[in-house]
Amino acid sequence: MSHTIRDKQKLKARTSKIQGQVIALKKMLDEPHECAAVLQQIAAIRGAVNGLMREVIKGHLTEHIVHQSDEVRREEDLDVILKVLDSYIK
């Protein structure tokens, strides 16, 4: 996963943002807040996780599918990413 290592700082920044959003949500649940505000925070977390997933998938597709010269390996890598997408979309 060389692409993940190369983009490590960017991915870590995204995970830190998600972590902060989850901490804020936990605090919201401990205090009285409007349901709409809680739902908005959950939607923000979901959007941040989706963005992280998009970046990792994009890197994986570029490095392991597009630039893969070995046809067998390319198909194996494609199967892996399709299984991950199936589990993510459920």
UniProtKB/Swiss-Prot annotation:
Q: Which GO terms describe its molecular function?
A: DNA binding; metal ion binding
Under the heading CDD domains, the entry gives: RcnR-FrmR-like_DUF156 (cd10153)
Q: Which organism is it from?
A: Salmonella choleraesuis (strain SC-B67)
What PANTHER family has UniProt attached to this entry? TRANSCRIPTIONAL REPRESSOR FRMR-RELATED, TRANSCRIPTIONAL REPRESSOR RCNR
Q: Which UniProt keywords apply?
A: Cytoplasm
Provide the gene name from the record. Answer: rcnR
Alphabetical list of InterPro entries matching this protein:
Metal_Tscrpt_repr, Metal_Tscrpt_repr_sf
Task: Tell me which family the UniProt entry assigns to this protein.
Answer: Belongs to the FrmR/RcnR family.
Protein's recorded name:
Transcriptional repressor RcnR homolog
